[in-house]
UniProtKB/Swiss-Prot annotation:
I repeats lie at residues 51-95. Keywords: Disulfide bond, EGF-like domain, Glycoprotein, Repeat, Secreted, Signal. Its main location: secreted. Disulfide bonds join 40-71, 51-69, 63-74, 76-89, 91-112, 96-110, 104-115, 117-126, 132-159, 143-157, 151-162, 164-178, 180-202, 185-200, 194-205, 207-216, 220-247, 231-245, 239-250, 252-269, 271-296, 276-294, 288-299, 301-310, 316-343, 327-341, 335-346, 348-361, 363-384, 368-382, 376-387, 389-398, 404-431, 415-429, 423-434, 436-448, 450-471, 455-469, 463-474, 476-485. The lineage of its organism: Eukaryota, Metazoa, Chordata, Craniata, Vertebrata. InterPro entries: EGF-like_dom, EGF_extracell, Integrin_bsu. Residues 51-494 are annotated as: Cysteine-rich tandem repeats. It comes from Rattus norvegicus (Rat). IX repeats lie at residues 415-454. The gene is Itgbl1. This is Integrin beta-like protein 1. It is found in: Secreted. IV repeats lie at residues 185-230. VIII repeats lie at residues 368-414. Glycans are attached at residue 405. SUPFAM superfamilies: EGF/Laminin.
């Protein structure tokens, strides 16, 4: 039993509801909702119009395809790193230009995809100072890349900064020195960057999973997991950390274009022929002493020979250790690093060179010569690699006179290095020439400014004992070559 007037109240509510429906737009959809969750009072067409950029026709992207439209309002979302914002999701905090790795070159702020430059700066990335106090010469010098080419021949120099040539409007040339050209990534057939299957960075394509090729033009018919499995070496590393896995096959790095020491090969790049350098025998000018073959960096010795370098004959009554010990003498190296040890006896090298001699090749009279071949500066004699100077002279090569006709002031002025320091603080001055400290054997050079430890070594010897270290570089004696003078180019060894 309803109270009196309840029936009249229901009639009033019903009539108001139907009046509201008749006043609503004909295309009103109860499924549209406002941000508050209440039904949207806009038609679908009007809601979408408000979510489109001005001037865009019906059916075009809503919210720049970066969000969803709710009752005429864009709710932006993220589909890649960064944040979308703006009334129509038209702004992105990563789209501003960068220069030298900095957004707006660090001289402005990013405002909806465009740099707002600080006072005194201009350019799309705020990279150009409005006033330039550099000379053209200095400006051009600052614009040179590592090959000394101004703006990589792909732009012009403005006050020490490169402006890349992007007259086509695509902006594919960029970088501090315009060194990056993403046109290299465009597929000739599809005219798409990386064939539409990868990202381009500085002219190189980085392909999506399942695609490979210089421009991601080839599709792989195996799963990424299977591809990785096929490329994994026995030690569990993909391509032994020496190559790139492409669709289940390893492309090994080209580590030695000269071919001097071999390359990397094998199904999983497990074989590094550079390791053969450790078994190269400079006295036989061959790997494995000429008595074996280097395979994957190790010697496979022929019958009758054994050892790391196949250097020990099996018919020798001495063990390898005994043989090496007899050849060492007082040196840490067999035959003082200047000869071949076989069955406890040293054969000094180079062959036929009487300047290297001794039971363990301990004497090397080449050390008494300068680069012109003059022994002890013409002022002494050589005895087992050391100069015995004539009266009135001293020094490693008898290069210093004991009497000096200079004043101390004149002498010191000739011993000062470029920074004004006397003999670089590592030696003493005598008659206008620096005598480097004997306590630090590795200090050398006209002003004691060189460190002989910077020279290459082989078999534990600087310049392999076959040359002179000259300020970090090996100057090899006749018949020897290589960064460490380790390669014999003279007559064939017997």
């Amino acid at each position: 039993m309803h109270p009196p007037g309840f029936k009249n109240f229901l009639l009033l509510v019903s009539s108001l509801f139907f009046i509201g429906l008749s006043a609503a737009p004909q295309s009103f959809s109860p499924s549209l909702r406002s941000l508050s969750g209440a039904p949207c009072r806009l038609s679908r067409a009007e809601s979408e119009r408000r979510c489109r950029a001005p001037g865009q026709p019906p059916g075009s992207a809503l919210c720049h395809d970066r969000g969803r439209c709710e009752c005429g309002v864009c709710i932006c979302h993220v589909t890649e790193p960064g944040t979308y914002f703006g009334p129509l999701c038209e702004c992105h905090d990563w789209v501003c230009e960068t220069y030298d790795g900095k957004t707006c070159a660090g001289h402005g702020t990013c405002d909806c995809g465009k740099c707002k430059c600080d006072v005194g700066w201009s350019g799309e990335a705020c990279q150009y100072p409005t006033k330039c106090d550099l000379t053209k010469k200095i400006s051009n010098q600052m614009c040179k890349n590592s090959q000394d080419v101004i703006c990589s021949n792909a732009g012009t120099c403005h006050c020490g900064r490169c402006k890349c040539d992007n007259s086509d409007g695509h902006g594919l040339i960029y970088g501090k020195f315009c060194e990056c050209d993403d046109r290299e990534c465009i597929d000739d057939e599809t005219e798409e960057i990386c064939g539409g299957h990868g990202k381009c960075y500085c002219g190189n394509c980085y392909c999506e999973a399942g695609w490979h090729g210089d421009k991601c033009e080839f599709q792989c018919d195996i799963t990424p997991w299977e591809s990785k499995r096929r490329c994994t070496s026995p030690d569990g590393k993909v391509c032994s950390n020496r190559g790139t896995c492409v669709c289940g096959e390893c492309s090994c790095h080209d580590v030695d274009p000269t071919g001097d020491w071999g390359d990397i090969h094998g199904d999983t790049c497990e074989c590094d022929e550079r390791d053969c350098r450790a078994v190269y025998d400079r006295y036989s000018d061959d790997f494995c002493s000429g008595h074996g073959q280097c395979n994957c960096g190790r010697c496979d010795c022929r019958a009758g020979w054994y050892g790391k370098k196949c250097e020990h004959p099996k018919n020798c009554p001495l063990s390898a250790e005994e043989s090496t010990r007899k050849c060492q003498g007082s040196s840490d190296l067999p035959c003082s690093g200047r000869g071949r040890c076989e069955c406890g006896r040293c054969t000094c090298y180079p062959p036929g060179d009487s300047r290297v001699y001794g039971k363990t090749c301990e004497c090397d009279d080449r050390r008494c010569e300068d680069l012109d071949g003059v022994v002890c500066g013409g002022r002494g004699t050589c005895s087992c690699g050391r100069c015995v100077c004539e009266k009135g002279w001293f020094g490693k090569l008898c290069q210093h006179p004991r009497k000096c006709n200079m004043t101390e002031e004149q002498s010191r002025s000739l011993c000062e290095s470029a920074d004004g320091t006397l003999c670089s603080g590592k030696g003493s001055c005598h008659c206008g020439k620096c005598i480097c400290s004997g306590e630090e054997w590795y200090i050398s050079g006209e002003f004691c400014d060189c460190d002989d430890r910077d020279c290459d070594k082989h078999d534990g010897l600087i310049c392999t004992g076959n040359g002179i270290c000259s300020c970090g570089n090996c100057e090899c004696w006749d018949g020897w070559n290589g960064n460490a003078c380790e390669i014999w180019l003279g007559t064939e060894y017997p």
